[in-house]
């Protein structure tokens, strides 16, 4: 096992400033070339204190920012119009990338695809409850209403009446 000091947060491994034990191949082929970690020795212990202090400051700022974004997203309902065949089955599916674009267009919030928790692409019409996982463990729930073009036109006509 190789002992490394993480310079940046690594998903499912640790936060910056932590010393972790990883297999040599993972260190040699991924963490070290991408500058995500350095080999832990006496000199890096001083770096560890500085990294921990920076991480704590960044964590506080990230949590505030994430909570503000979560308040905007929480309870929001977005509408995605899709094409369907005569039996009501969708052509294709609604993907995470499309959901991210919907949120950007509707709420002017920049998210990454990894923030949306979706196990499988959405392949049915109706209302789907989704979760956004933001930094520092902050989550927000919102609804995605997938409608056929015909159903969307009908709902617009009902709103006008």
UniProtKB/Swiss-Prot annotation:
Keyword field: Ribonucleoprotein, Ribosomal protein, RNA-binding, rRNA-binding
One record GO biological process: translation
A GO cellular component entry from the record: ribonucleoprotein complex
Keyword Ribonucleoprotein applies: yes
InterPro entries: Ribosomal_bL9, Ribosomal_bL9/RNase_H1_N, Ribosomal_bL9_bac/chp, Ribosomal_bL9_C, Ribosomal_bL9_C_sf, Ribosomal_bL9_N, Ribosomal_bL9_N_sf
Name of a matching Pfam family: Ribosomal_L9_C
Keyword RNA-binding among record annotations: yes
UniProt superkingdom: Bacteria
TM annotation in the entry: none
NCBIfam families noted in UniProt: L9 (TIGR00158)
Protein family (similarity comment): Belongs to the bacterial ribosomal protein bL9 family.
PANTHER family in alphabetical order: 50S RIBOSOMAL PROTEIN L9 (PTHR21368)
Name under which the protein is recorded: Large ribosomal subunit protein bL9
Gene that encodes the chain: rplI
